Amino acid sequence: YAFAENVRVLAPSPQRVTPRCPHFGPGQCGGCHFQHIDYAAQPGYKRDVVIDQLRRIGGFSDPPVRPTVASPDAWAYRYHATFQVDAAGNLCFVGTDNATLIPIDECHILRPELRDLLAELNFEDVQGLTRVRVQAGSAGDLMLVLSTADDQAPELEVTMPVSVNLLLSDNEPVNLIGASTVSYMVRGRPFRVTAGGFFQVNLPQAEALVGLVLEALDLHGEETVLDLYAGVGLFTAFLAERAALVTSVES
């Protein structure tokens, strides 16, 4: 296969739309890949990508890939995102070349409270900062998770209601200001996630994933289940209600 870059659109598809994000496109932010496609058509294209890779790389002649489950929200669904910090203190995503840092001043897939937070952040005079994770909980609680080159806490002035944590190079969190966790509610069950912990970025889709897993397993209370790479135990919590034993493993 080869990599290609669009030079000119001769006849646009009816499914082609104008990308909402000013950072979308060749040579720009590498985070999103389908903003030029109407969202109603995106699930089908994403399924085609999976089928193509299973055939081309995996060697499957007719892979049984089910239809993609669309998100109820095409925009403003991400509850957290991690930015790289360039030498000027700009918050950046990695570009389409997987190397260049692209400064980002707005991101339309972030939750509104995170977009508001992003607009207020200024790290121009903060030394040694390498990464910044912005995170929101179900109830709107906000957290910044900072990473530095030397694992030392940077000097900050915080004038907004946000907790701040430092994530060390060994992935251990150090609480600096406010809470050390954010909270999420999935299918009526609360989850607390520490700085650096993994949780699904799209809560409605997380609920859909749990439902699909439970439906597919069809547990009757006598089974032993392994939840591998379990994160904070999103699936484990619901599996444990239905199986005899659930073993949760995280790297």
Where are these regions (language model features)?
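Accessory RNA-recognition modules of RNA-modification enzymes
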Residues: Y1-S251
